[in-house]
């Protein structure tokens, strides 16, 4: 039977509607999913995979969680889309503000994608400050808006036309606080905003060095630039309050996505009203969207956050992470194979290097050929990690102990086999 992916290639560029799904960096034929439930999905060939991608971190409760599905079913009876302010939007906003303990002097705006939300955040920063320059950090991914497409791990795929935006976007090395401070001392008065991932997830998992995030926020306050924390990946995942709760200094603007929609398309920008009221129709900064605040996505998102409220939710996630990944870490340390496992808050990545990378240049020194072999070995045995050496993989509360034990053994064997070929 021909693989269904060949038919996908007839209709979609590269057979996909988002590039990394093509699995080219791991050199496998991408699975075409027919159904998914809990911690697994089934492809068009009838093979089942334990899923550690989870729709790129969107599914912290796993696939097809009954409570979220029920919320969507009930929402369908009320209508799929209104193009008007809805009760569901208001109810979901109340839930978010209550859950994250956001003060009443803040406001939120819903959109459909992370790219829309980050694009809106930087446009808002420019509108508020009336300054032109945006600073980002190399290796951090903030969506596919032109303003962000430089110094990312798939740089070679970007058209030269993007260079037109680069004089207004400056990309600096992640974790290099001294260079950031030097740059801000020179041009801080022209910087509208500084956008950053609090934990990088799109060059693999790269953690901030102590003081780096605080240094960004503190410097922005001194220069009048707006700090923008991109929590599309980390929001509602690494702790109850997301990554922002892990730092004493809070950013000016927060961006959410993925888990926010409970598996449906939803994102948001949240900031004090003094900033948010620059958005149209109150202010001069334009942003719009036909499906922004879609009622089905709002219903799914509210159900997703309600599940996060359950007692010991993050304690349970932490235990799953520890039970699954600690033995793999121990094997790596004892065997001396050239692999570094980086993990935080149920995100994890394997870097084929003896040292933990702290920035994009160090990530690019890792051996992607060995990663490819490792990935293929695990994939053949039914383990689906995020299919790139530059992407995080994710755990969820749906991962069963039985499947985790199996996956753990497969990953250990695949690591050993891949490294034996060096």
From Swiss-Prot:
InterPro entries, A to Z: 4pyrrol_synth_GluAld_NH2Trfase (IPR004639), Aminotrans_3 (IPR005814), Aminotrans_3_PPA_site (IPR049704), PyrdxlP-dep_Trfase (IPR015424), PyrdxlP-dep_Trfase_major (IPR015421), PyrdxlP-dep_Trfase_small (IPR015422)
Entry similarity comment: Belongs to the class-III pyridoxal-phosphate-dependent aminotransferase family. HemL subfamily.
Pathway(s) annotated for this protein in UniProt: Porphyrin-containing compound metabolism; protoporphyrin-IX biosynthesis; 5-aminolevulinate from L-glutamyl-tRNA(Glu): step 2/2
Main location: cytoplasm
Gene Ontology terms, MF aspect: glutamate-1-semialdehyde 2,1-aminomutase activity; pyridoxal phosphate binding; transaminase activity
Biological source species: Chlamydia muridarum (strain MoPn / Nigg)
GO CC annotation: cytoplasm
Alphabetized NCBIfam families for the sequence: hemL (TIGR00713), PRK00062.1 (NF000818), PRK00615.1 (NF001864)
Protein name: Glutamate-1-semialdehyde 2,1-aminomutase
